[in-house]
């Protein structure tokens, strides 16, 4: 299957999707191939030089594992192209809160899954340790995290992330999956446990309120709900990533 990051040019300054599509249309499928066969493309001299320089730099930065280089240059909607290259340094992230506004509400829980282990960080217990854990990774995967999870975390800890961030909501919508995370899970044939089936975001707020009033079982249910959220993010991208690539290449035709 085509490696989308190694076939990306749109992150190079002043190179747009039209030029990228032209390169793909010529059958060039990776940066090394471009360096060998760029002469088959009819390009203005300045643009050719810009592409050659950008491709050489991209090869070097990818070889050194510099995720920040791509996080800063890839459009937000296309960060998913980096998924495979930074898969081993990925954290799947989901938060629970008391409401929708980072300024007026609080994070109650942060769930982080690295593909092997899930860690849960809870307000009043260990919430501040989540920032150290997130610092171990180069790539974050969320659902609606660009508008919700990351702004909340950045406000909570007064930080700015430099990770590659794949907000699955956008590439999923492009391949036909719209609506909330739970609706998309159903569309993909995924099921929740009996304890968490049917729980909504509003229910999660209520569970936290019950916990604050002394109900420890409510906290356990909230942890399980949050854990299923982050674990399912990995399942979703594994199931849909090939279709994201297929759709991207189809769009250029």
Predicted segments, located by residue:
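Conserved RNase H-like, two-metal-ion catalytic cores of nucleic-acid enzymes
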Residues: 71-139
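Acidic active-site catalytic centers that drive phospho-/nucleotidyl reactions
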Residues: 94-96, 149, 167, 229
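N-terminal accessory regions of nucleic-acid-interacting proteins
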Residues: 1-87
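Alpha-helical elements of the RecA-like P-loop NTPase motor core of helicases
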Residues: 21, 150-151, 234
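Acidic, Mg2+-coordinating catalytic module of metal-dependent nucleases/exonucleases
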Residues: 189-253
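Conserved DEDDh/DEDDy metal-dependent 3′-5′ exonuclease domain
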Residues: 109-194
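Short amphipathic alpha-helical segments
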Residues: 104-105, 153-155, 238
